[in-house]
């Protein structure tokens, strides 16, 4: 069934509650990367251009104490949003009460208002009560009472059941997806349920345990699953290969064995690695094929692996990439990740979808973002979606 989209709603004269994902990096009141704010603009603009009142909810960071609140106000985000929209944005420094209600009642059609960080509700009078992240039913009901319709455009939190997404939605007659949410559901959904073949998944990162559900779910769907990053060496161990001092999840070796058996020749592991004696960008490194020698740890895929992976990707029609090929934050071990990102940018006939912090950062660093079909805004959410799980935030959106 298709989901209701914001453009299906009549928003004129309506108070439209929009859950956005403004969880951006902020240091000393300065925003490091405003991509998530930019990504929400189409939905916000649609509402205000159609004479609705846009009331925005978002979390920012994690709030475990009153102290945490000091550096995690959404005020700088509201200011940046005002610049991007080129119009005034009202910021309300509270999450409930008369000040918020009055500000909403004073809105005119086409106005934009940002409510303070929803996770401020997780700590009340110094006590950790988790009203937002624990989906307190009274809070969801209260927030829902502030508007007429609800739009969820925060894919990044769709795998969480919070008061500001599932809580509000369960108290509303009409719940629609924003344009960003619609895009995520479309591209990730098609990749998993209706991919063009050959379909290749590239999964990297440190831990098998983070990606196990995805690998398991994609074995039957993908033509090839390329493995990179630290989790490679748990698979090496499962094959009886030497891993030196490389990262390994000993309690996942049996699981890796069963994946190797189940996947057969669909599973593509690196054939060579860049190794060093210490987890350090400045110590000498070398390329080794196959097993990792004693006293060394693998920190990136090697040149031969890059070539072999590119050969697999060359004819792909659908590619989903999540997770780095090596220790991306160290420049000497970022090459595998960067080369894969660069190569994906050349696949003009394929649907290419990238998710996960390091993969996304690599794509941005290379400037190939516009050559890819879709860059997912949700880390954990996109992984759970690729696992075939139903995400609470999406389940709560009305069907057409």
UniProtKB/Swiss-Prot annotation:
Entry binding sites for ATP = 211, 329, 356-359
Arranged from A to Z, the UniProt key words for this protein are: ATP-binding, Cytoplasm, Glycolysis, Kinase, Nucleotide-binding, Transferase
Q: Which residues bind substrate?
A: 21-23, 36, 59-62, 119, 160
Catalysed transformations (reactions): (2R)-3-phosphoglycerate + ATP = (2R)-3-phospho-glyceroyl phosphate + ADP
Name of the molecule in the record: Phosphoglycerate kinase
Reply yes or no: does the keyword ATP-binding apply.
yes
What SUPFAM superfamilies has UniProt attached to this entry? Answer: Phosphoglycerate kinase
* The keyword Oxidoreductase is annotated on this UniProt entry: no
* Pathway(s): Carbohydrate degradation; glycolysis; pyruvate from D-glyceraldehyde 3-phosphate: step 2/5
What EC number(s) has UniProt assigned to this enzyme? Answer: 2.7.2.3
Task: Supply the gene name.
Answer: pgk
Q: Name one GO cellular component term.
A: cytosol
Its BP terms in the Gene Ontology are:
gluconeogenesis; glycolytic process
Tell me its family.
Belongs to the phosphoglycerate kinase family.
Q: Which PROSITE patterns match?
A: PGLYCERATE_KINASE
Q: Which Gene3D superfamilies match?
A: Phosphoglycerate kinase, N-terminal domain (3.40.50.1260)
Cite the PANTHER family for this sequence.
PHOSPHOGLYCERATE KINASE, PHOSPHOGLYCERATE KINASE 1, CHLOROPLASTIC-RELATED
Assembly, per entry: Monomer.
